[in-house]
Amino acid sequence: MRILVAMSGGVDSSTAAALLAGEGHEVIGVTMRVADYSDAARGRSCCAPDDVEDARAAARRLGIPFYVANVEARFRERVIDRFVDDYVEGRTPNPCVACNTEVKFDWLLARARALGAKLATGHYARVEERGGRRRLLTAADPAKDQSYFLYGLGQDALGDVLFPVGALAKPAVRAEAARAGLAVAEKPDSQEICFVTLGDAGDFVALRAPARVRPGEIVSTAGEVLGRHDGVHRFTVGQRRGLGLAGPAPRYVVRLDAAAARVVVGSAEEASRDRFEVREATWVSGAPPGGAVELRVKVRHRHEGERGTVRARAGGAGAEVRLARPVRGVAPGQAAVFYDGDEVVGGGRIA
């Protein structure tokens, strides 16, 4: 089988390539160049120059062809610009979801198909055929599971993608990399947003859109002015740290009013929600569930999930979510992903 492997230069995707090559497949390595990095940014994140060279070295070690695909324009339009727009408009984006949906499993998958190949990545997730359809499942290692970022994959895509490390725990992946003689076997995992190479997300947004960043007031839910801020792009709903406010009780961001350049803060209870709407919903099966269904809902990657009822809106492009109990930090713009046991049912952007 011919398989195109998306190689980021990390241990997971390099091991995915090694496992597939070891099974005798015709493996082709490719790294996506998503941004123009300066020398100062080297080594900070995946897909930076040093990582491209790590991917190239892994491919050389495995004896497979290797290419670099320039996707800067598409990535800028579909991921970076949306990231900036969301932050300045008071939402909390999830660029990894956008990258997977709009670039990796769209543009790159199309290139793989043009070569008569499947597409493999180093994601920790699994795909299985059950009941006559393809199902997206959580990884065998719960601590590394990345299915949250993949909810946008439908039946068509799942038929042509492979997740070779999804059934392995991280130590086993590193052991396989060492066995294959890969220099990245002990390379640390990337923790940063891949295109934010200097500073944090707030600094990145301020540099990309300085004219759209406005200082403003930090106010209580009762309207009392408590302080000032440098821009709503530096905050997210549910945030506690970094508010710069004194007081006997902790305060959390309750909502962001970008139009008024106002950050509203309150108690943990006020920053929690048990009902919300989801927009831009997609369903792995290709069709929304009928009526109200009981599912586990994750409102961010590291969230264990909360039991709730999900009711798809007419047409399936949206959904109403009612949680069994309030959850703090249900941030507009973030992904809400729905699970039935170990199966990803679908997801969308929190309204």
From Swiss-Prot:
Site annotation Interaction with tRNA: residues: H123, Q334
Domain of life: Bacteria
Region (Interaction with tRNA): 144-146
GO MF: ATP binding; tRNA binding; tRNA-uridine 2-sulfurtransferase activity
Enzyme class: transferase
Disulfide bonds: C99-C194
EC number from the UniProt entry: 2.8.1.13
One Gene Ontology CC term in the entry: cytoplasm
Binding of ATP, residues: A6, M7, S8, G9, G10, V11, D12, S13, M32, G122
Alphabetical keyword list: ATP-binding, Cytoplasm, Disulfide bond, Nucleotide-binding, RNA-binding, Transferase, tRNA processing, tRNA-binding
SUPFAM superfamilies tied to this protein: Adenine nucleotide alpha hydrolases-like (SSF52402)
InterPro entries: MnmA-like (IPR004506), MnmA-like_C (IPR046885), MnmA-like_central (IPR046884), MnmA-like_central_sf (IPR023382), Rossmann-like_a/b/a_fold (IPR014729)
Active site feature: C99 (nucleophile), C194 (cysteine persulfide intermediate)
Pfam family, one: tRNA_Me_trans
Keyword RNA-binding: yes
Main localization (coarse): cytoplasm
GO biological process: tRNA wobble position uridine thiolation
Entry's localization field: Cytoplasm
Segments traversing the membrane: none
Catalytic activity, reaction form: S-sulfanyl-L-cysteinyl-[protein] + uridine(34) in tRNA + AH2 + ATP = 2-thiouridine(34) in tRNA + L-cysteinyl-[protein] + A + AMP + diphosphate + H(+)
Family, similarity comment: Belongs to the MnmA/TRMU family.
Function summary: Catalyzes the 2-thiolation of uridine at the wobble position (U34) of tRNA, leading to the formation of s(2)U34.
PANTHER family assigned to the protein according to its UniProt record, in alphabetical order: MITOCHONDRIAL TRNA-SPECIFIC 2-THIOURIDYLASE 1, TRNA 5-METHYLAMINOMETHYL-2-THIOURIDYLATE -METHYLTRANSFERASE
HAMAP family named among the record's database cross-references: tRNA_thiouridyl_MnmA
Full protein name: tRNA-specific 2-thiouridylase MnmA
Protein species of origin: Anaeromyxobacter dehalogenans (strain 2CP-C)
Gene: mnmA
